Amino acid sequence: MIVRRLDEVTTVDWGNGLSRRFLLESDGLGYTMTDTTVRAGTRSRLEYRRHLEACYCIEGTGQVVNADGTSHPIEPGTLYALDLHDAHFLIADQDADLRLVCVFSPALRGDERHNLDSTDFSEY
């Protein structure tokens, strides 16, 4: 059994917020679970070519926008899943941080960070 508290986990500044990584590849479960904060007013160009990701919003509001421009509002109680390694924009509204519980499969190593300075979608 694995039991972890927030103050015991790896915290990574992923580019536009913090990712608290509760489960990692080294845990041997095959997936990662994170508590991720997206800073208010930020827009991130993201794509996971080696991972599938599902995110459940627990705080804040924003939107996830497909590469084709289709926008989906995010608010507490909303889940979105990137089941096709979708390139997307993750946007946190101006008034507050967006907080998501995320699951990645396969698992992350734990040290991954995005390059948000690129004109391409950042990936890992």
Identify the function of each model-found stretch.
Residues 1-31, 113-124:
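A short, N-terminal "cap"/entry segment at the start of jelly-roll beta-barrel domains
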Residues 17, 33-49:
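Conserved short histidine dyad/triad with adjacent acidic residue
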Residues 28-31, 39-42, 59-63, 86, ...:
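Short, charged/polar surface micro-motifs in flexible loops or helix N-caps
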Residues 36, 54, 81, 96-112:
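A short hydrophobic beta-strand segment most commonly corresponding to one strand
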Residues 37-38, 49-64, 103:
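Short, conserved beta-strand element in jelly-roll/cupin
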Residues 45-46, 64-65, 82, 88-95:
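Short beta-strand His + acidic residue motifs that chelate non-heme Fe in jelly-roll/DSBH
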Residues 68-85:
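Short acidic-glycine-tyrosine-enriched beta hairpin
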